[in-house]
Amino acid sequence: MKTLQTVHRKLFDQKLAWSQIDKKKALAQPEQLELLREACLVESYLPVYTGKMMALFWDDLNATTIFTIESIEAYGHYYVLRRYLETIGYKPVSDEEVVELRERERGVIYTDRVRELVNFMGTEHFAAQFFLDMSQLLDEPVLAAILPEFAAEEVVHSQFAFDLLQARIRKDPGARSEILEHARNFKHVGAYVRPYVPPAKGDNVRSIRAFNEKFEKLLGQPLSDFLVEEVPDAVR
């Protein structure tokens, strides 16, 4: 499809110096490549996910603008990661694999705006940390150089969701309890279609702490405080 190839070149191909990729360095880190491949698969699902979110928020102009931006930037991440894996010759992602993944949740219709915003906010928060950590773990410099940009985009996406949730609270202070309930049951969007979404580093405490602080800004109290309140006195 020549037109699509032209758009790819214009929007995404210039992001990396493809001819300068050090394949030897890249292939020397198979554990990190597996993580990148998993991230690529999750990103491949997001155009379908954002389509569902557009349907859910069809009458919210700010939200639909936000998910349009998310869809474009998530696709950019997917495209770059997929082409990178193909370029270095490490387990290229196939069209069939992407379609099979997208099919897993094809019949699901989102109905709870708060639940999806909470899950989206958390997903993008952890995705930002993932790409930042990967940029520090990779020895191959070409991809490592672009991943902080991916991380910065994910930070903005998470803030988008925060802003939408904050607007709901301003309109209805009672929304705090609903947000809290979904925060307790947070689910990574990648886990909608994948069995497990691994962090880049085993120690994810810093990112979890920052997630807790995000809820403190939103709800006026850290999420951890609410969770402690639910623990019976006998086990404290």
Model-inferred region functions:
Residues 1-236:
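Non-heme di-metal
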